[in-house]
Design a protein with these regions (language model features):
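A recurrent flexible, glycine/aromatic-enriched loop bordering the glycosyltransferase active site
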Residues: 204-222, 240
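Conserved donor NDP-sugar-binding/catalytic core segment of glycosyltransferases
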Residues: 166, 170-200
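Glycine-rich, basic loop-to-helix element that forms the pyrophosphate-binding segment
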Residues: 137-153
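Short aromatic/hydrophobic "clamp" motif used to bind/position activated sugar donors
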Residues: 158
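A conserved acidic beta->alpha catalytic loop
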Residues: 111-121
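C-terminal, non-catalytic tails of nucleotide-sugar-dependent glycosyltransferases
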Residues: 63-75, 186-189, 194-202, 210, ...
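A short, conserved alpha-helix in the catalytic core of glycosyltransferases
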Residues: 220, 226-230, 237-264
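Short, acidic, metal-binding catalytic loop of nucleotide-sugar glycosyltransferases
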Residues: 96-105
Length: 314
């Protein structure tokens, strides 16, 4: 990689000094001045900064710079939303499959968080009319990123897709059809789970097709209006795990009589390595997962009115 010239390094140091003095207006001005020279400065964890060549796409300073279109009317049928935080080969596999196996009225929306290992570059390789790409300079928590994408788009149905979920055919249309079939259906997904009442809400169990208590975030389609009414995922959910189940119940609470369903039959998709679980720091993963589940219990435990109907009537 080319080394930045001395004058750019000097500007970056001035920016770091301005940030330390909390002169953020000056820091922003210096950041833009650096960008005009063809370089990008990024704050490093624990202090300091890195300087890299400016990529062939716009990079926003943070997810707060994404547009807020939450008050705008629906403009198309669905948007499939993907978070990109590394693993460029996974990005290519997942996004190419989405573009290949979804209809022309479906937009694929991806948020690149810091171009980790060139994942943002891999995303940009697939640019086109149906790919809406956002690039920000650094990382963001799971909920913050998901909420930014929800507010930025204007589809009738907003879809979470994990990078580990790879379409082998049109796995989206059955979910959209399930939502279209009944106004009470606010969400449909690939895999559903039910609260284990025998375990006093301390766990969930896999659910068969039909009405379910919660949908897992591997592939989770939701009415945008319902997702916005629920306030999006909880702002304290910094990690994905258990946040999908928490949000499922938030949808139910926000929309009286809401149904969440898994359509019958096997969807044409597969799950590759789930990086969020398998390649995250175990201590961080377990800590944040427990925080989210405890928050779920505090808010929803005992709310049997929010459960899907059981075959035994319970």
């Amino acid at each position: 990689m080319a080394e930045p010239p001395a004058d750019v390094i000097a500007l970056a140091q001035q920016r770091a000094d301005a940030r330390a003095a909390r002169d953020f207006a000056a820091a922003d001005r210096l950041r833009d001045e650096i960008a005009a020279t063809g370089w990008v400065v990024t704050d490093a964890p624990g202090g300091g900064f890195t300087i890299t060549p400016k990529p062939p796409y716009d990079v926003l300073a943070s997810i707060r710079d994404l547009p807020d279109n939450s008050e705008q009317p629906d403009t198309h049928r669905a948007t499939v939303s993907v978070l990109v935080d590394g693993w460029p080969d996974d990005v290519r596999t997942c996004v190419e499959a989405l573009l290949t196996h979804t209809a022309a009225d479906v937009v694929v929306q991806a948020l690149d968080l810091g171009n980790v290992d060139g994942a943002g570059d891999a995303l940009h390789e697939m640019r086109g009319d149906r790919l809406q790409e956002w690039h920000v300079a650094g990382p963001a928590g799971w909920s913050d990123a998901r909420n930014a994408l929800l507010r930025a788009e204007t589809a009738r149905v907003h879809v979470w897709c994990d990078l580990s979920t790879v379409f082998t055919g049109d796995a989206l249309s059955p979910l959209l059809d399930a939502i279209d079939a009944d106004d009470a259906v606010v969400a449909a997904g690939w895999r559903g789970v039910n609260v284990d009442l025998a375990d006093e809400w301390r766990s969930f169990v896999p659910a068969p097709a039909g009405d379910v208590d919660a949908i897992l975030g591997y592939l989770f389609a939701m009415r945008r209006s319902a997702a916005l009414a629920a306030g999006g995922p909880h702002p304290k959910a910094r990690f994905y795990r258990n946040a999908d189940m928490e949000f499922s119940f938030a949808l139910r609470e926000a929309v009286p009589g809401a149904r969440l369903v898994v359509p019958p039959g096997e969807l044409p998709c597969r799950q590759d390595r789930h990086r969020g679980y398998s390649d995250s720091d175990p201590a961080y993963r377990d800590k944040e997962s427990a925080k989210t589940y405890n928050r779920f219990l505090q808010r929803f435990r005992g709310r049997t009115d929010l459960l899907a109907p059981r075959e035994d009537g319970g």
